[in-house]
Structure formats: C-alpha cells, structure tokens
C-alpha cells in the first residue's frame, strides 16, 4: 500500500503554525491544509447568511456544503476570493465559537482528510494530530507565550492593512485559548506522541529547521 506522508502542526492561535506549516510544505514539496481556514469560511458564510451562532443545524449544513478552493496564499468561497475577509478578527472569533460544535466538526472531517494526497501533506490546525490524522508520521505541537502570540498577530494584521489593538488582541487570545482548551469537541491538546516546540523566542526559520530535522528522522520513504 502506498504511504502518503503526513506532518501535522497543531497549536493555539498565533503560535506560528500556519507560517511554519507553509514553509515546511514548500521545503518537502507536500500539499498544504490550513484547517483553520475551513472554520473561518464557515464563519464568513454563516455571518453573511445571518445565521445565529446557536443555530447548529444551519451551521452544520453550511459546513457540509462548503464550496471552497485553495491556491497559493489565496482562498475562494463560491468562486469569490475571500483571502483577506476570512482573516478579520471578528471572523476568527466567530470561527472559534463555531468550532465548539461537534456536528460542524464532523461535517468538515472528510473534507480535511481528502487533502491527503501524494506526494504528502502538511496539515495545520488544532486537532490535526489528535483527530483528523492520528496516524501521521510526524506530529508537532507549537506553543508560545500569549504575549508573544499577541505581538505576532498584531504584526500580521497591520502588515495586511487591518487595524488592530494589541490589548484587545491579548484579551481575544486568552478567551480563545480558554474556549479551545475546554470545549467538549476535540479540545486543544497535543497528541500523546507529538513533539512539543515552544516558539516564543524562536525565529520562523529556526522552527522550520527543527520540524524538518524531526521529519527526516521518521520519514519512511527517506
């Protein structure tokens, strides 16, 4: 049977997992799955449709019918490019609230697993190593102090031309962390066999180099 290598990179908001995953995927020539973007797409689509966050049936229906296309640093929803729209903080907060619902997560599970194709996949999110790809060859869990993550998020937003307040971001991150860790559906936690990587005082390149070193040691087709 053909082995499709998978590297999972999980962690809290603004831990650097998206940037690290992108660079690792480029380095090894694998496909990339930004699972958080899927929840943001559900958040955006449901917000535009005026769906209440408590309406689980409608949220699940939107998730199961998600018409999405990914390109290099770009995302389309029903043919409309929404790369910038899904990165708004309000949409991120809405996505975090939506992600607590198990039916929504179930609706997105098969879509996420469909990204597992040759030559391999790097998947970033919050439950990639624990739920979506429990048999991944390498599981990484990124951590960073909430202060370091708030600074990173602030820079990301400002660089994209989105206004931001670092004190508000700090509060939002703390609230999201609490929600992600305590939710009943796939709470944020490292897989038992995950490699832990604290990026608080690391550059992106240092984090990428560490992940690549770990993968070289376990890659079955090396």
UniProtKB/Swiss-Prot annotation:
Nucleotide-binding listed as a keyword: yes
Keyword Cytoplasm: yes
Catalytic activity: CMP + ATP = CDP + ADP; dCMP + ATP = dCDP + ADP
GO annotations of cellular component type: cytosol
Annotated compartments: Cytoplasm
InterPro entries documented for this protein: Cytidylate_kin (IPR003136), Cytidylate_kinase_dom (IPR011994), P-loop_NTPase (IPR027417)
Subcellular location, principal: cytoplasm
Biological process annotations from GO: nucleobase-containing small molecule interconversion; pyrimidine nucleotide metabolic process
GO MF term (any one): ATP binding
Keyword terms: ATP-binding, Cytoplasm, Kinase, Nucleotide-binding, Transferase
Binding-site residues for ATP, renumbered to this chain: 11-19
EC top class, as a word: transferase
Signal sequence extent: none
EC number: 2.7.4.25
Residue ranges of the TM segments: none
NCBIfam families, A to Z: cmk
Similarity-based family: Belongs to the cytidylate kinase family. Type 1 subfamily.
Protein name per its UniProtKB record: Cytidylate kinase
Species of the source: Cupriavidus taiwanensis (strain DSM 17343 / BCRC 17206 / CCUG 44338 / CIP 107171 / LMG 19424 / R1)
């Amino acid at each position: 049977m053909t082995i499709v290598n998978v590297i999972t990179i999980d962690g809290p908001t603004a831990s650097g997992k998206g940037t690290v995953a992108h660079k690792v995927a480029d380095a090894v020539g694998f496909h990339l799955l930004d699972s958080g973007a899927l929840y943001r797409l559900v958040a955006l689509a449901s917000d535009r449709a005026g769906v209440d966050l408590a309406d689980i049936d409608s949220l699940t229906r939107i998730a199961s019918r998600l018409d999405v296309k990914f390109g290099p640093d770009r995302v389309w929803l029903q043919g409309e490019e929404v790369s910038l729209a899904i990165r708004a903080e309000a949409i991120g907060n809405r996505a975090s609230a939506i992600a607590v619902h198990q039916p929504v997560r179930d609706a997105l599970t098969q879509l996420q697993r469909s990204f597992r194709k040759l030559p391999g996949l790097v998947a970033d999110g919050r439950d990639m190593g624990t739920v979506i790809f429990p048999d991944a060859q390498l599981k990484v869990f990124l951590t960073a102090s909430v202060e370091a993550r708030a600074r990173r998020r602030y820079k990301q937003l400002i660089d994209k031309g989105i206004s931001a307040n670092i004190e508000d971001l700090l509060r939002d991150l703390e609230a999201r962390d609490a929600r992600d860790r305590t939710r009943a559906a796939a709470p944020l936690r490292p897989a038992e066999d995950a490699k832990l990587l604290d990026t608080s005082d690391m550059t992106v390149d240092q984090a990428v180099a560490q992940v690549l070193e770990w993968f070289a040691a376990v890659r079955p087709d090396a």
